C-alpha cells in the first residue's frame, strides 16, 4: 500500500497496474505449479507417510516416505550393502537421481540424472566410453530394467548407449525386484 501513496496521480494507474499484474502473475504461476507438478512422493488417497531408516544410508535418518517406497528402498539398500556396492560409483537411469544421494554413491558419469533431456547423448556417450576399468554399478527402474531385458533396439538413444555399455562391460543383473534392477560388471 505504501508504494502507491507517493505515485503522482497522472502516472498512478500505470504503476499500480504493473504492480498488481506482477503480483497476480506470481500467484497464478504458484497455483499452476502446485496443480500440475508434484513430487514423486505425493501421496495417493488413503496413504500415509511413515518414518524410515534405509540400510546403507546415513542421509535418510528420520526420513518420511510412503510404505511402498520404504519397502523398495529398504530392499535395494539391503542388497547394495550386503554386496558392498555402496562403495562403488553408480550410473542411474529412469528418473531416480536421488538414489546416488540416498546411498552416498558417487556418479560414474557427469550427472546423477542421465535421462534428463537437457543432458546430451554426446556427453553421456563420451563419459561411458571413458570408462574402461572399475566399472560402476548400474541401477535402473523396473520399467527400464524390463526394457533392457528384452534385447531389442531402443527408441531412447541414451538407453541404447547404456545397453551397449552394459554389453561391453559384461554386466549381469543381480537384483530385479521391488522397483529396481541392479547390474554389476563380471
Indicate residue ranges for each PLM-predicted region.
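Membrane-interfacial entry segments at the cytosolic side of transmembrane helices
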Residues: 7-25
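Extracytoplasmic
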Residues: 24-185
